[in-house]
Amino acid sequence: MHARLTSKSAFPAAGVAAGLLFVTWFAAFHIGVVQRADQSILQGFSDIGQRNGIRPVANFVANLCSPEPYLYFAWIPMLVAVMRGRPRVALAIAVILLGANLTTHLLKPLLAEPRPAWLLHGVAQIGAASWPSGHATAAMSFALCAVLASPARLRPLVAAVGAAFAVAVCYSFLALAWHYPSDVLGGFLVATTWTLLAVGALLALPQRQPAVPSVSKTATWRALGPSAAAVIGAGGLAVLVAVARPHAVVSFARSHEVFVLGAAAIALVALALATGLMLAVRR
């Protein structure tokens, strides 16, 4: 039996996401071991960002989700939904994009508080109003909306590409030391909460055709193919880098063990959210 998101399950799931958002905030601001991990992961990203040629690329990618550039492409999922004759889906996407990004904008000053930085070296002080990350919210909300807007047969691929986009944006601004890693998770969860709320409302409406088109004809293992390929590709790239510069990679990994785990966790969370939505709306 294929998993399926319904209005009755979407709203509790949104509540769980909101609860995890609170837990993430509390841990990032009030639990010492999490704060130390936050700093260690950020230090690793910052050290990579200091290497030749990294900063220009990171600046370009990170700024894709700055307000002005974002407006140039954020509307694409809505346009796709309208062109596919799904005006309600287009409206839900508009609600997700506006609601998620506005929520993050309001939470930043409300929860602003300086965080300890005793483990950071060569990293400029990050502003108190950094949680949750607006760039992470924008990137993940766009990725999730792209999943909802895309044709059923393309949704697995769109989920993998959308997750890769969100990871690229977040890795980039972390390399530039704009945010703590916990800010990224906060942004992801804001986007997820709004997506679940909007999809729940969409599914609760009476309709003659599925609010979110079916992909039931695609076997689960085939639907997971693009996401699995993304994981394998990332692993293969890591192996190639390690083979090309074994001593440098091993030395860096040994001195940044928490960073390695944190970077992998961010990527897996992004992929899990996009892929999970893709599977959850299957009929």
Q: Predicted regions span which residues?
A:
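Alpha-helical transmembrane segments
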Residues: 12-22, 99, 228-236
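N-terminal transmembrane-helix/juxtamembrane module of multi-pass inner/ER membrane proteins
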Residues: 1-73, 108-124, 257-264, 275-283
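Interfacial segments of alpha-helical transmembrane regions
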Residues: 8-16, 79-100
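Hydrophobic alpha-helical transmembrane segments
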Residues: 8-20, 36-45, 104-109, 129-138, ...
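Membrane-embedded catalytic cores of phosphoryl/pyrophosphoryl-handling enzymes
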Residues: 120-266
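Transmembrane helix-loop junctions in multipass membrane proteins, especially transporters and channels
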Residues: 33, 86, 109-117, 156, ...
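Structural signal for the C-terminal ends of transmembrane alpha-helices
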Residues: 79-87, 146-153, 200-206, 275-282
